[in-house]
């Protein structure tokens, strides 16, 4: 587990933005589900290089995300966006999708987050490691 805890001027971050596969996502989300905070959210990037298992793996992570107690979950990348179709409309309301990290950065610049505990988890290729400086 290469996660790093960082407290910024505005938020508390758990950063694990360099590696993501199904088992590491499970571990990170299970751990995050145990945390108590009034304003929990996650920013999850696609898991890369999963091949034929990708659709099922991303759908499984979405189901797990529903159990973490988060108020919102931002999804970055096309695999998570496709997986959203496996959820009901009520379930999908928790999630917000972004094409790439640049879209997330634009949102954070327009609408900064404050007083959140945020898990940032995704494959290195999703470039989520660029986000902490904006949080």
Feature names for model-found ranges:
Residues 1-135:
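ATP-dependent carboxylate-amine ligase
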């Amino acid at each position: 587990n290469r996660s790093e805890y960082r407290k910024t001027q505005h938020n508390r971050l758990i950063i694990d933005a360099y590696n993501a596969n199904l088992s590491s996502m499970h571990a990170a989300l299970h751990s995050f589900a145990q945390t108590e905070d009034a304003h929990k959210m996650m920013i999850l990037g696609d898991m890369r290089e999963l091949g034929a298992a990708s659709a099922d793996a991303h759908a499984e992570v979405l189901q797990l995300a529903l159990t973490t107690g988060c108020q919102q979950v931002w999804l970055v990348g096309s695999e998570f966006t496709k997986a959203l179709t496996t959820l009901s409309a009520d379930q999908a309301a928790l999630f917000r999708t972004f094409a790439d990290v640049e879209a997330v950065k634009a949102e954070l610049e327009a609408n900064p987050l404050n007083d959140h505990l945020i898990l940032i988890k995704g494959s290195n290729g999703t470039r989520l490691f660029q986000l902490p400086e904006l949080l």
